């Protein structure tokens, strides 16, 4: 089966949720899943379910750098090193019998210069033919849009955060 590229993007809720849902579906079909998270600390509730599945590996950065807007130059440099190392590690792992490779928030990591988009594009072009790939995040470049076979935009029309309601465990994270 030819692997395709999915891109879930936009300012609306549901990008990671869609990627998790596809991961569970693939795992349920006996597929091997590698779920990598960028810009998050690995504590989101959905990762508990993924980690419990036998044929799913979750990869996150061990260090929490906080929100990009709050990072100083030194923290951005450290984050760039850590996320670039994570990307290299998971790209290598994804070529070893993985069926579905999720790069959650990789689009945002590219936008912030924390991983090199050119590295990601080169990987997408040279990946194993059967490898299905999911990318999530806001504001993808035209290069990422062009590389994707599925492009789904999640657009916010209304969100409780706009009324001051904070993210809730088990719903938003």
Q: What would you call each of these model-derived segments?
A:
Residues 39-42, 64-65, 107-108, 139-142, ...:
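Conserved nucleotide-binding/hydrolysis micro-motifs of P-loop NTPases
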């Amino acid at each position: 089966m030819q692997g395709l590229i999915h891109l879930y993007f936009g300012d609306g809720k549901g990008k990671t949720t869609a990627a998790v849902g596809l991961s569970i579906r693939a795992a349920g079909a006996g597929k091997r899943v590698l779920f990598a998270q960028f810009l998050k600390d690995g504590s989101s509730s959905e990762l508990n379910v993924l980690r419990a599945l036998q044929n799913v590996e979750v990869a996150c950065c061990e260090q929490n750098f906080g929100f990009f807007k709050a990072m100083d130059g030194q923290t951005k440099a450290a984050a760039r090193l850590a996320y670039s190392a994570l990307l290299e590690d998971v790209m290598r792992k994804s070529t070893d019998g993985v069926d579905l490779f999720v790069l959650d928030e990789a689009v945002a990591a590219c936008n912030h210069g924390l991983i090199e988009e050119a590295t990601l594009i080169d990987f997408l072009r040279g990946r194993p033919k059967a490898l299905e790939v999911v990318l999530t995040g806001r504001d993808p470049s035209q290069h990422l849009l062009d590389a994707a076979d599925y492009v789904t935009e999640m657009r916010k029309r209304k969100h409780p955060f706009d009324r001051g309601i904070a993210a809730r465990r088990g719903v938003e994270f």
